[in-house]
Amino acid sequence: MIEAIGNQYVVARPVYSTKAFGEEFKKTYGHHKTFLDHLKGCCSCSSQKAKKIALSLFPIASWLPAYKIKEWLLSDIVSGISTGLVAVLQGLAFALLVNIPPAYGLYAAFFPVITYFFLGTSRHISVGPFPVLSMMVGVVVTRVASGSDTSPALSSSSAENDSMIEEKVMVAASVTVLSGIIQLLLGVLQIGFVVIYLSESLISGFTTAAAIHVLVSQLKFMLQLTVPAHSDPFSIFKVLESVFSQIQKTNIADLVTSVIILVVVFVVKEINQRYRSKLPVPIPIELIMTVIATGISYGCNFEQRFGVAVVGNMSLGFQPPITPSVEVFQDTIGDCFGIAIVGFAVAFSVASVYSLKYDYPIDGNQELIALGVSNIFTGAFKGFAGSTALSRSGVQESTGGKTQVAGLLSAVIVLIVIVAIGFLLQPLQKSVLAALALGNLKGMLMQFAEIGRLWKKDKYDCLIWIMTFIFAIVLGLGLGLAASVAFQLLTIVFRTQFPKCSTLANVGRSNIYKNKKNYADVYEPEGVKIFRCPSPIYFANIGFFKQKLIDAVGFNPLRILRKRNKALKKIRKLQKQGLIQVTPKGFICTSDGFKDSDEELDNNQIEELDQPINTTDLPFEIDWNADLPLNITIPKISLHSLILDFSAVSFLDISSMRGLRTILQEFIRIKVDVYIVGTDDDFIDKLARCEFFDDEVTDSIFFLTIHDAILHIWMKKDYSTSKFNSSQEKERKFDFTINTNGGLRNRECQVPVETKF
């Protein structure tokens, strides 16, 4: 019965052990499906199920028929044009990160948008080149392509021959296709949950480090220096060394141009950010600066007068599709897996933000399929891996984009550049593209502010951020990502291996139990210790759990058990020698000349001392806290009951079960009653299946709550120390109440409680 009195509540119910609760309230068991049942469900087909699968694979079929032309079309047109112009410039700029000619960036900006239009579940993200992925692909291209020597004049008109360019394009395309295959397989197998191993802190630290890599990689274009390519660990430092060793060769025209572009882009982007509520659309500063820079470069003939590196020949139209290289697959499968996971993690996180903002569902596994098909399609046409760029998606959403129709129209803009007006960009300086690429890094570089916020919120997450950043900077993006995931998992192991165990006490003279160190006014029942473990118990932390429990109770139960068994052996020995007599009233000493000795025992004798104490041959029960005859001394303990709060223990493994049973047996053998509270039924069922229980450790030690166990302990002690009338002993009904002045228990009967154990 629950009764509310003002802002308080009074509960009158029986004291339940888990076993008693199960006897009174029968569980309902649902039908357990076998593997064959699941297989039949997967293989069965109906018209409704077929329709559901079709809508799942092609989400466009669900939202396109409901498209509101009058309300959404104009917004999507404006958004599509704006996003398309940004996509063109980002495609050209991010191609430099891949170490291939800028024209191939247009393919990466076109093809994934088409496939995502049909297969994607997000209505607002813009799929295409992303600087972090471009950098990761570029690292692989640098490592795999033979004789890769990245120079600022990277185009078909440069000193680098056509075969070298084709090899780099082949490597980038093959890596993209394999990454797409991995994403497609993960989506088909419905294991998109792998992205959960990349926490927000890890992604933030990784993308920040990738932004630093992008920044360093673009220095050679901004300064027009010939910098050897590096892809091994510490490559970023080697690139910096190469840059500064030839800094005197800097092309001043490229440097001045890139600095001006960079400053203007940063300033205008800040204006867009601060006044986004007042501006109808963000100022397309990248487009404006590109048009101005192209016009000035062409009109003043920068290429001839100052020797600047320009985009160069832009062949119109598409190139024929290619067959990926199996050799590249074999050499880059690890890198491709990292590219696939990072690409999906970034895209899904951005899509999740917009889905929450506009209240529509997204499907992680379908997103994997959409991105996988997009990358396969893009790689086949000589593009490179893509995801979603935060800045480009922000443009699509902020300019009024409602659906992926805006994305389709942005692809039309890219298509026009590819087939018709791409030649107009030939005079554009590569330093301008490098500056535009860096201009899009502001958001990622600002993530350094996360360190302070994370330190205040969670030091483990802050450490993950810092170590991820260091790993990605020092080891490179591929190895850095693997090391970061390993370190993150290690922190999880560390948290569970060394949990913050605590001793609980009663707070407020009620049924609330908290860490006694955190509160001044607490009540700790005499002879009772309440110990809480806030993590799973498994093979790695069972030893730590035992030591913390020993520290909490103040003694080692195994040592006490051995001392008592050893004392019992001495008593029997003295009895045989006639030095003491054992009577029902206790021990009678017949001599006082015995000296206690603590001789060493062999292994067999130690094993005997670990067994339960057997006093059946004695006419009375030994009080181990009383003085023993003839100076036989053993440690005295006041603890009679131990409560283990397992409400936060989600699982036990086989190794920890053995260790836990040993711990419980040691306490039980020294007459300390052990109770476990807060576990669910599955936990106890697993213990039963694993043969955890025996004659000493039974399932009667489990109680629903700490307070149930406390009341049971008090009533149990009352039974053994008090005399009751026959009706009370028969029905075992006693009355307890909460006394806010003197403690939890009051002998005056006010609240009837039925005792069950």
From Swiss-Prot:
Point out the glycosylated residues in this chain: N161
Q: Which CDD domains match?
A: STAS_SulP_like_sulfate_transporter
- In the UniProt record, the signal sequence range is none
Q: Which SUPFAM superfamilies match?
A: SpoIIaa-like (SSF52091)
List, alphabetically, the GO terms of the cellular component aspect.
apical plasma membrane; brush border membrane; membrane; plasma membrane; sperm midpiece
Question: Which of the residues are on side Cytoplasmic?
Answer: 1-71, 115-124, 198-201, 272-278, 357-367, 426-462
Give the STAS domain ranges.
518-713
Show the stretches that span the lipid bilayer. 72-92, 94-114, 125-145, 177-197, 202-222, 251-271, 279-299, 336-356, 368-388, 405-425, 463-483
Q: Which Pfam families does the entry link to?
A: STAS, Sulfate_transp
The protein's location, in the record's own words, is: Apical cell membrane; Membrane; Cell membrane
PTM comment: the record says: N-glycosylation is required for efficient cell surface expression, and protection from proteolytic degradation.
Quickly give the catalysed reaction: hydrogencarbonate(in) + 2 chloride(out) = hydrogencarbonate(out) + 2 chloride(in)
Which biological processes are named by the entry's GO terms? cellular response to cAMP; chloride transmembrane transport; intracellular pH elevation; membrane hyperpolarization; sperm capacitation; sulfate transmembrane transport
Q: How does it sit in the membrane?
A: Multi-pass membrane protein
| UniProt GO molecular function | bicarbonate transmembrane transporter activity; chloride transmembrane transporter activity; chloride:bicarbonate antiporter activity; oxalate transmembrane transporter activity; secondary active sulfate transmembrane transporter activity; sulfate transmembrane transporter activity
Keywords linked to the UniProt accession: Antiport, Cell membrane, Chloride, Glycoprotein, Membrane, Transmembrane, Transmembrane helix, Transport
- Main location per the UniProt record: membrane
User: Extracellular face: residue ranges?
Assistant: 93, 146-176, 223-250, 300-335, 389-404, 484-757
Q: Kindly state the positions of the motif PDZ-binding in this protein.
A: 754-757
Stretches of the chain forming a coiled coil according to its record = none
Q: How does it assemble?
A: Interacts with PDZK1, CFTR, SLC26A6 and NHERF1. Interacts (via PDZ-binding motif) with NHERF4 (via the third PDZ domain); interaction leads to decreased expression of SLC26A3 on the cell membrane resulting in its reduced exchanger activity.
Q: What does this protein do?
A: Mediates chloride-bicarbonate exchange with a chloride bicarbonate stoichiometry of 2:1 in the intestinal epithelia. Plays a role in the chloride and bicarbonate homeostasis during sperm epididymal maturation and capacitation.
Which family is this sequence assigned to? Belongs to the SLC26A/SulP transporter (TC 2.A.53) family.
Record protein name field: Chloride anion exchanger
Name its species.
Answer: Rattus norvegicus
The top of its lineage is: Eukaryota, Metazoa, Chordata, Craniata, Vertebrata
